[in-house]
From Swiss-Prot:
Keywords: Membrane, Transmembrane, Transmembrane helix. Pfam families: DUF3464. InterPro entries: PAM68-like (IPR021855). GO terms for biological process: NADH dehydrogenase complex (plastoquinone) assembly. The keyword Membrane applies. The chain crosses the membrane at residues 84-104, 113-133. It comes from Arabidopsis thaliana. It is found in: Membrane. Has no redundant functions with PAM68. Residues 55-64 have a biased composition (Basic and acidic residues). This is Uncharacterized protein PAM68-like.
Length: 168
């Protein structure tokens, strides 16, 4: 190939006509500056979320009674937040740790991890972490004078029944 290209001083391309192209390669009317959008969009609707609350009330609904739900005592609130942090953080941390271990096993060629294993791990651990929010709040004893059990199963059963009583 090298001998073929070097054997001629001038390439055969020089025999092409040297006429200039008479058409322009671009039309200046179709070019848009980079700092301006191609088309201007206009809002066709007005804001609806900033109206007064009186116009959006339904006539058949009574006003909620502020005394209907008593406030949660600070001690119970702190216990509830602690339970939520533990019941969310434990499966979340475990899930991240398992994914990291699976990554190390695959990188060091110890175990060729099937693709479904990380997906299943993520589903189980992160899903139980999401359920931990509800369990953390349900497993807290709502009486400030009483203490919680270790896992809160008894409190969760009591609070579950109480929660469904209030709805009916």
């Amino acid at each position: 190939m090298r001998a073929l290209l070097c054997s001629h001083r001038l390439l055969p391309l020089s025999s092409l006509s040297r006429t200039t192209v008479k058409t322009k390669s671009h039309n200046p009317k179709t070019l848009y500056p980079n700092n301006k959008p191609r088309w201007e969009s206009k809002l066709h609707a007005g804001p609806k979320g900033f109206q007064s609350s009186r116009t959006s009330e339904k006539p058949g609904r009574p006003d909620p009674d502020p005394e209907d739900d008593p406030p949660i005592p600070q001690e119970v609130f702190e216990r509830m937040m602690g339970r939520i942090v533990v019941s969310v953080g434990t499966p979340l941390g475990l899930g991240v740790a398992i994914l990291k271990v699976l990554e190390v096993l695959k990188d060091r060629n110890v175990w060729d991890v099937p693709l479904w294993v990380p997906y299943l791990t993520t589903l189980v651990t992160f899903g139980s972490s999401a359920l931990g929010i509800a369990y953390g709040s349900l497993s807290t004893n709502l009486d400030p004078a009483k203490t919680n059990s270790l896992f809160g199963l008894k409190e969760a059963k009591e609070n579950w029944v109480e929660m469904w009583k209030e709805d009916q």
